[in-house]
Amino acid sequence: MASNESGGGNLMDEFEEAFQSCLLTLTKQEPNSGTNKEEIDLEVQKTTNRFIDVARQMEAFFLQKRFLVSTLKPYMLIKDENQDLSIEIQRKEALLQKHYNRLEEWKACLSDIQQGVHSRPTPPIGSGMLQGPGGGMPPMGGTPPRPGMMPGMPPGAMQPGGPMQPSPHMLQAQQMQQLRMISRQMPPK
């Protein structure tokens, strides 16, 4: 073990050899060589244990070097921590910027929807005009209401006044209410 600790190169070479022998043992296929399953299992166990042992020795070697650096040059640890923190800050700033961009997109979308709703002329409530199947926007919650159904009503219930679609004014009021609810749920900047 003293010879392994004297140079990191020898330990690195041993680690590489142990890894290669472990892979070789696991991947070789010699069904006609006369070896039985127990011998193969024993060889796999042996090479795997050697690989784990060399890996532990290498870990101890690097931990010793890290300890030496921390005692002889403590500013190096602080420098490493500062670098890690600055990388983390950059990552979080990029994430925040991404969220701000998405928020701006949603605000623009809501603004467009609100302007579109206010700029459309609304017929009087009692005009009796029915919406066509493609007219108007579907509610924000999902699928458009079926003919004869108001949004939020159970499928078997009839709306008052018969199986008519709600008036455009009613849809506009519902959409405005949904927009207000969404804008209340959005976190402030």
UniProtKB/Swiss-Prot annotation:
Keywords, sorted A to Z: Activator, Coiled coil, Nucleus, Transcription, Transcription regulation
Top-level taxon in the UniProt lineage: Eukaryota
GO biological process: regulation of transcription by RNA polymerase II
Annotated region (Disordered), positions in chain: 124-147
Biased composition (Gly residues): 129-139
GO cellular component: mediator complex; nucleus
InterPro entries linked to this entry: Mediator_Med28 (IPR021640)
PANTHER family: MEDIATOR COMPLEX SUBUNIT 28 (PTHR13512), MEDIATOR OF RNA POLYMERASE II TRANSCRIPTION SUBUNIT 28 (PTHR13512:SF2)
Function: Component of the Mediator complex, a coactivator involved in the regulated transcription of nearly all RNA polymerase II-dependent genes. Mediator functions as a bridge to convey information from gene-specific regulatory proteins to the basal RNA polymerase II transcription machinery. Mediator is recruited to promoters by direct interactions with regulatory proteins and serves as a scaffold for the assembly of a functional preinitiation complex with RNA polymerase II and the general transcription factors.
Oligomeric and partner information: Component of the Mediator complex, which includes at least CDK8, MED4, MED6, MED11, MED14, MED17, MED18, MED20, MED21, MED22, MED27, MED28, MED30 and MED31.
Family: Belongs to the Mediator complex subunit 28 family.
Protein name in the entry: Mediator of RNA polymerase II transcription subunit 28
Lineage: Eukaryota, Metazoa, Ecdysozoa, Arthropoda, Hexapoda
Gene: MED28
